[in-house]
Amino acid sequence: MLGKMTGQEALDSGIVEALNFGPYLVVNGEACEVGGFTEAGLNPRTAIGQRADGAFLILTIDGRQPSSMGATYEDLIEIMMNYGAVNAANLDGGSSTYMVQNSETENNPQIITQCASLYGPRKMATSILVGRADQINTQYE
């Protein structure tokens, strides 16, 4: 669900868990105008989207590196729409971005994407976990 609401409106809607992010990239299948946002040039990016069939799309792009220049908001819109997103939004894309995949055969998480930082990895208070509840181990360090 995309939208701006007060805490009380969210509770009245039955929302139990929520994240705040932006700018919106795609809403109801239409590309959004993202002009006026800071950091609009090439930067590390993270985005989340959802297709009409309910599937989630999560994208990470490193940047400010010789091997990866980063992406613009317009790049994110194009990628998300190419993969069928009907709704998508930008998340924080700096060194707080990690994409981790758990091994199919053992409980051994592997880092797929880690956006570089001069200061090393950041501790994060919030993460997005995708999978069946009985298969998600939240005890990673």
Predicted features and spans:
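Gly/Ser/Thr/Pro-rich low-complexity, intrinsically disordered segments
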Residues: 1-141
